[in-house]
């Protein structure tokens, strides 16, 4: 039921879904720390009713060093404050037993961000907070162990943003689309980097329309963009 901004990943032959928000701004809203998995997408098993990390949504979730790594997020979508946003780092090899690698990583607390793994290193970039105070970031951080972090840049050339998507494709990290405020703006730009410091914009005469909260994935050596909020909600599928 906590299907708004949960964390998802394919890991160890299973699809995983964890955390997320329920019921929007309506009574009974809540965040989750449930962990679910499935081998076929139709039949789901609850691996954990309450993981060790606090209920949250909009964390980053990646595979690193043979484990799932969960980074940051927010404990409250619409009704929180600055303390709701997290910068803790957790890892698990089975979705059941979670280890807190650090309660306070070097990067500022954030949600709606992304993480990536490239050349044996773990990267965190962008994101921030939506309400009550809008914060958007375009910094890039790197770690070799998830505990000690180094800032590669305080300001990447792409605009600070929330609700963007990222992937690792052809030995590069990619940042695609997203949203920023003041004024409210959806993005349709595409950036890539091999090291997190130097970013290059990929420009194309034919590209998908500006959007946020879209899906990005790699399949058959192509980079795919699916869905997203333009508005309205969209069901286009594009590939590069």
Task: List the predicted regions and their residue ranges.
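Kelch-like beta-propeller repeat domains
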Residues: 1-240
């Amino acid at each position: 039921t906590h299907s708004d901004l949960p964390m998802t990943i394919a890991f160890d032959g299973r699809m995983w879904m964890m955390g997320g928000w329920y019921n929007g701004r309506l009574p009974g809203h809540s965040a989750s720390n449930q962990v679910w998995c499935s081998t076929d997408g139709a039949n789901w098993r609850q691996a954990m009713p309450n993981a060790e990390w606090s209920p949250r949504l909009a964390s980053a979730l990646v595979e690193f060093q043979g484990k799932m790594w969960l980074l940051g997020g927010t404990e409250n979508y619409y009704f929180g404050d600055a303390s709701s946003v997290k910068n803790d780092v957790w890892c698990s090899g089975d979705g059941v037993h979670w280890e807190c690698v650090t309660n306070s990583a070097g990067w500022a607390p954030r949600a709606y961000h992304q993480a990536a793994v490239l050349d044996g290193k773990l990267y965190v970039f962008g994101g921030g907070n939506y309400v009550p105070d809008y914060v958007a970031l375009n910094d890039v951080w790197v770690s070799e162990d998830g505990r000690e972090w180094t800032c590669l840049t305080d300001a990447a050339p792409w605009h600070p943003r929330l609700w963007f998507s990222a992937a690792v494709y052809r030995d590069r990290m990619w940042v695609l689309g997203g949203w920023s405020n003041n004024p409210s703006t959806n993005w349709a730009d595409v950036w890539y980097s091999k090291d997190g410091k130097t970013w290059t914009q990929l420009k194309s005469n034919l590209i998908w329309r500006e959007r946020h909260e879209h899906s990005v994935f790699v399949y058959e050596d192509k980079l795919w963009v699916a869905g997203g909020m333009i508005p309205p909600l969209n069901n286009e599928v594009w590939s590069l």
